[in-house]
């Protein structure tokens, strides 16, 4: 039946604190934020800039409290104050998702990149092995 790529973590509405074109690449993200949603250092992420519509993929470095810093080429796509959504995905066997479900952790940030809201989005198996129900619950 194959595999399916599902979101497992999302940082919603984080703000760029700085952009460093001279750094080696990546995006530096507040360590507490990535740990809260389960993103690992060096994990690939997709980034959507809500302030200008640009999108890019990169990898994560852990940073200091409040830090959201696109580095290298990604720094050319953002400027301080821009609002971003950062997604991380995992590849799962489709049948396993239908049988056991899936959940993703979502953190909504305030203007200082602190957790404003935290919740889980889940796929819950229907029991017939062919479908799932979607659920979203605040933690």
UniProtKB/Swiss-Prot annotation:
**Enzyme Commission designation:** 4.1.1.11
Q: Which Gene3D superfamilies match?
A: 2.40.40.20
Coiled coil feature spans? none
Source species of the chain: Microcystis aeruginosa (strain NIES-843 / IAM M-2473)
* Protein's cellular compartments: Cytoplasm
Which residues are annotated as modified residue Pyruvic acid (Ser) in the UniProt record? 26
Which named protein is this? Answer: Aspartate 1-decarboxylase
Name the protein family.
Belongs to the PanD family.
Part of which pathway?
Cofactor biosynthesis; (R)-pantothenate biosynthesis; beta-alanine from L-aspartate: step 1/1
**Cofactor(s) essential for the protein:** pyruvate
Q: How does it assemble?
A: Heterooctamer of four alpha and four beta subunits.
Q: Name one Pfam family in it.
A: Asp_decarbox
């Amino acid at each position: 039946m194959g595999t399916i790529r599902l979101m497992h973590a999302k940082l919603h509405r984080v703000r760029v604190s700085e952009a460093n074109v001279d750094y080696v690449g990546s995006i530096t993200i507040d360590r507490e934020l990535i740990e809260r949603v389960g993103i690992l250092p060096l994990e690939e992420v997709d980034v959507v800039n809500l302030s200008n519509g640009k999108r890019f993929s990169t990898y994560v470095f852990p940073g200091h409290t409040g830090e959201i810093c696109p580095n290298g080429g990604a720094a050319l796509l953002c400027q301080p104050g821009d609002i971003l959504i950062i997604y991380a995905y995992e590849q799962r066997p489709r049948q396993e998702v239908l049988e056991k479900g899936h959940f993703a952790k979502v953190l909504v940030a305030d203007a200082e990149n602190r957790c404003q809201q935290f919740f889980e989005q889940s796929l819950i198996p229907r029991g017939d092995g062919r479908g799932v129900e979607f659920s979203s619950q605040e933690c």
